[in-house]
Every structure is written in structure tokens, then in C-alpha cells.
Amino acid sequence: MEHLETCYNSLSKQTYKDFEIILVDNNSKDDSVKFTEKNYPDIKILKVNYNSGFAKAVNGGIKISIGEFTLLLNNDTECKEDFLEEMLKGFSDKDTGSVACKMINFYDRSIIDDAGDFIKLKGSPYARGHGDQDIGQYDRHKYIFGACAGAAMYKREIFYELGFFDEDFFAYYEDVDMSFRMQIAGYKCYYNPKAVCYHKRGATTKTMTGFETMLCEKNLIAVRLKNYPFLTLLKCSPYFMIVRIKRYYNFLTKHSSSLFMSAVKGYFKGLLEIPKSLRKRKFIQKSRTVSSEYLENILK
């Protein structure tokens, strides 16, 4: 509840006032719903009677929203008073499909949490600037690969054009997948460093777990198969394998055998889902308006 109260209160102080709040309660075990109903009666609540995963939960919220733009916001965040106002400024270009903010560590506000999401051409997704001291190095407005769905704004119509978050992902990398699909279709992601929120990273999911590791490994295979240009996929496949072997060796030697086994399990789950990923690829590639060179250039 402490996370929700902080988040709600920061939204109530926004300089931009024309918005609705939707709480998607993904079968929480605390009194989040009762707390919200009692203290914030204007908030719309979507109750899910089982843990459907992040992707399905936010899809449900998007579908019942009514605004032109949709902000996805984790409950463990606090937004500066002009956050919504600054996020909306990012849509001045008609080709902008999403806006990324500058996320700061809630507990140490001199530390960057996320300054936009990227994916390495031959490696894995990463949060730009995560853990860095905030000395102004991420204060430049620019177009980037994608936004972290923990605090990202999207044109709502895009979900109806390109599809919603992939519910087969359950959680992790579904935002990377969506960013990729938007880039393929010619929609840009605008990073506005003046839109600032504070994030208690891991406050509701804890740290590295076997389940998280399994999902990340499984979903990364799907992200690549669905979105990479075909020749890029072929060219980079050997490097993908080398990077995974190094990663799994690190799990085995520096973490635990259970984490290693979770990673391997996720990898093989991803392989088993190849036919499904390739079917999705056909749909995604039909919307492609950019070149392979463009896509390779935005992968850092």
C-alpha cells in the first residue's frame, strides 16, 4: 500500500489535469483494492482474479482506457509534478509512437534507474544509464530505441494497429518487443529527460529469481525471431549462442545451479515456441516501413 499511496499522491499533484487513472489489480494478496476504493474513489479498478502476468494485465487496462494517449506506470513510482505535461510534449512529431522518461532511483536520487531502453545487436536488452551517477549525461532530448513500460506513454491507437503487448511473454521484455514492433512500422520513441519519475526498482518483484531468469531467456528468443531482419538474424545467430554460453557459465560459477537450470529451461522453452514466434513474425513484418540498415543502426 505504501507504494500505491506515494504513486497516487504524485499523480494528484500533476500540473496536467485531464486524465483518468486505472488500477489493474493482478490478483494482489494485500488490500490494494480496498485501500484504493476507500481513499481514491475516482480511480477505475480492473480486477483480475488470477496472476495473468504483466502483459495481459496492462493490455486489459489499455482496452478500457478512453484517452488518446496511454501511460503505463508501475505502482512503485513517484512522478514529478510536471511529469504528464512533459511526457505529452514528446508527441509533437506525428511519427512519435511512444515517449520515454528519465527514471531516477527512488532511494538515491543521484542515481539513474533508466534513461530509455535499448537492445544490443548481438546481446541482450538493457536500461540505458542504469546505476550511473546522474551528472547530466542523459539530459539531451533524442530519439531512442524504446521506453521502459514501468513508466512509458504510448499513442493508444498504435495497439489497435500493431497489436497489444505479447501475452505469451507473461512478463519481461514485452516492452522491448513492443518497441521493436513500433520501430519496424516506422514509429519513433522520443526520450524527454525533463519528464522525471522516481522508481523503487524491484520493490514488488524482488531481485533475480529463477522464474524471472527463465522468462527473460525464453522471451529474448521470441524478441529476436519476431523482429530482427532476416539477414541480420542469420548474421548474428553465432554471436547469440556465444553470449548465451558466457551468460550461463556466469550463472553456474557466480550464482547458483538452480539459476543456471532456470536459464537453460527458459532457453529450451524459447526454442519450443519457435513455430509460434515465426507465425507472429509474418504479421509483424507486414507492417515494416523501414530498412534493415535503419534497424541495425538503432540497436546499440
Regions inferred by a protein language model and the residue ranges of each:
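Active-site-adjacent helix/loop segment of glycosyltransferases
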Residues: A185, C189-R279, S292
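Glycine-rich, basic loop-to-helix element that forms the pyrophosphate-binding segment
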Residues: C7, V48-S65, N75, E86
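Short aromatic/hydrophobic "clamp" motif used to bind/position activated sugar donors
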Residues: T70
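A conserved acidic beta->alpha catalytic loop
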Residues: S10, D25-K34, Y50
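A short, conserved alpha-helix in the catalytic core of glycosyltransferases
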Residues: F145-V196
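Short, acidic, metal-binding catalytic loop of nucleotide-sugar glycosyltransferases
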Residues: N9-D18
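A recurrent flexible, glycine/aromatic-enriched loop bordering the glycosyltransferase active site
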Residues: I111-D114, L121-Y126, D132-E157, V176, ...
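Conserved donor NDP-sugar-binding/catalytic core segment of glycosyltransferases
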Residues: T77-K120
